[in-house]
Curated annotation (Swiss-Prot):
Known EC number: 1.4.4.2
GO terms classed as biological process: glycine decarboxylation via glycine cleavage system; nucleoside metabolic process
Xref: CDD domains: GDC-P
GO MF entries: glycine dehydrogenase (decarboxylating) activity
Domain of life of the source: Bacteria
Physiological role: The glycine cleavage system catalyzes the degradation of glycine. The P protein binds the alpha-amino group of glycine through its pyridoxal phosphate cofactor; CO(2) is released and the remaining methylamine moiety is then transferred to the lipoamide cofactor of the H protein.
Entry keyword set: Oxidoreductase
Family indicated by similarity: Belongs to the GcvP family. N-terminal subunit subfamily.
Catalytic activity: N(6)-[(R)-lipoyl]-L-lysyl-[glycine-cleavage complex H protein] + glycine + H(+) = N(6)-[(R)-S(8)-aminomethyldihydrolipoyl]-L-lysyl-[glycine-cleavage complex H protein] + CO2
Protein name: Probable glycine dehydrogenase (decarboxylating) subunit 1
Quaternary assembly: The glycine cleavage system is composed of four proteins: P, T, L and H. In this organism, the P 'protein' is a heterodimer of two subunits.
UniProt organism field: Brevibacillus brevis (strain 47 / JCM 6285 / NBRC 100599)
Entry keyword annotation includes ATP-binding: no
């Protein structure tokens, strides 16, 4: 039982030593002085059998706090949502169980059709004309959008709101450095949204794009109409990073003038799973379509007039024209795009709207419940399913108290925004019940008054 997996047999070892012209493994370390070599047996436990190994790691895993053992109010970019049971059932089918789009699409019509439907649903949600077959995650989608804007406009200045997810801004910074793109951050106002007055002062004719998040990192809904006017008034593109579920109740960015809409499909059928893997989406206009990174599935007809699906506009991609490609990315997240596609299909258009509305309504109930307990809600702007609460103690201390009560608390904004020390970002999804929200309010009141 203990020796189920053997990297090499004694015969293998003898043959390797003979090939090397030595008689023992010790001779491989002849360059290391004898006096500093370790001799004897290592002070480590003996190998475990497979059942004992499984039991050991199960014991370690049970020490973790997770969504099954605790009530979760943590979001900040990764959320706990309902996943229809059909998602995993379909993902594990042999026809679909691959992480990649095929290079011989004519033999993978089912998978290509599923990805085509993914693109179609992304376009419906975002109000855009064309979408690709997915990106790695929301952060890389955002960074790729900025580089696409710089390449299309020929300008090297990008303005990004501080209300965009801090980790996404970090990825953007890495991309910008390599492409010699200047990044300028614009602050937020007292309402927790992008300061449009400061933005207008920063934008000039050398600006390639303005990037905002909708809803933003604090959960608040940005005024895309006002920002669109500022961007297009100076010839810049408007890029929005949007939670796709929120677009079930919010006006589509495309209808508000966005040129590129990106985001993370995690709310649809993709588990939190320690922060990844995820699936980014990327949507734009037909005018910008040939500048878009990633793979695109198109619909066509074969010589018999039957509908078929192909990978189209491949000359944009790295595996065709490396030096002239639109991006270094010529991959995608096909399996997770399929998960999102199945989840959206299972929910349906009305189901997505209802799920989004439940998030909005339950988050607003939570805000009112906390206010009734004397807790301070920082911003008054319209929000989706997250909001900021000011505490009178460090967030880590409060979260420790919540954990003892069986609750996973919010995100510590002070980690990324020094001005928001002792501020927590709470997320409330459709899975939270009235009773759970009431318990959160009572526990927060007790902890902050202790």
């Amino acid at each position: 039982m203990k020796y189920r997996y053997l990297p090499q047999t004694d015969q293998d070892k003898r043959e390797m030593l003979e090939t090397l012209g030595i008689s023992s493994v010790e001779e491989l370390f002849a360059d290391i002085p004898e006096e500093v070599r370790f001799k004897g047996a290592l002070n480590i436990p003996e190998a475990l059998s497979e059942p004992d190994l499984v039991k050991y790691f199960t014991h370690l895993a049970n020490k973790n706090v997770n969504f099954s053992t605790h009530v979760n109010f943590l979001g900040a970019g990764v959320y706990q949502h309902y996943t229809p049971s059909t998602v995993n059932h379909m993902l594990l089918r042999g026809e679909f169980f691959t992480a990649y789009t095929p290079y011989q699409p004519e033999i993978s019509q089912g998978e290509l059709q599923a990805i085509f439907e993914f693109q179609t649903m992304v376009c419906e949600l975002t109000g855009m004309e064309v979408a690709n077959s997915s990106m790695y995650d929301g952060a890389t989608s955002l960074a790729e959008a900025a580089m696409m804007a710089a390449g299309h406009t020929g300008k090297k200045r990008v303005i990004v709101s501080r209300a965009v997810h801090p980790e996404a801004r970090g990825v953007l910074k890495t991309y910008a450095y390599g492409q010699n793109v200047e990044l300028v951050e614009v602050g937020i106002n007292s309402d927790g949204v992008t300061d449009t007055a400061a933005l207008e002062a920063l934008v000039d004719e050398n600006t390639a794009a303005i990037i905002v998040q909708y809803p933003n990192f604090f959960g608040n809904v940005e005024d895309l109409g006002a920002i669109e006017t500022i961007a297009h008034g100076k010839g810049a593109l408007l890029i929005t990073s949007s939670n796709p579920l929120a677009l079930g109740v919010l006006e589509a960015p495309g209808k508000l003038g966005a040129d590129i809409v990106v985001g993370d499909m995690q709310p649809f059928g993709i588990p939190a799973s320690f922060g990844g893997p995820h699936c980014g989406y990327f949507a734009t206009t037909t005018k910008l379509m040939r500048k878009m990174p990633g793979r695109i599935v198109g619909q066509t007809k074969d010589e018999n007039g039957k509908r078929g699906f192909v990978l189209t506009l491949q000359a944009r991609e790295q595996h065709i024209r490396r030096e002239k490609a639109t991006s270094n990315i010529c991959s995608n997240q096909a399996l997770l795009a399929l998960a999102a596609s199945i989840a959206m299909t299972a929910l349906g258009k009305q189901g997505v709207q209802e799920m989004a509305m439940m998030n909005l309504q339950k988050a607003h109930y939570a805000k009112n419940a906390l206010q009734a307990k004397g807790l301070e809600i920082v911003f008054t702007s319209p929000f989706f399913n997250e909001f900021v609460v000011k505490l009178n103690k460090p967030v880590a201390e409060v979260n420790k108290g919540l954990l003892a009560a069986g609750i996973i608390g919010g995100y510590d904004l002070g980690l990324d925004y020094p001005e928001f020390a002792n501020h927590t970002l709470l997320a409330v999804t459709e899975l939270r019940t009235k009773e759970e929200i009431d318990i959160l309010a009572a526990e927060l009141e007790a902890i902050t008054r202790a």
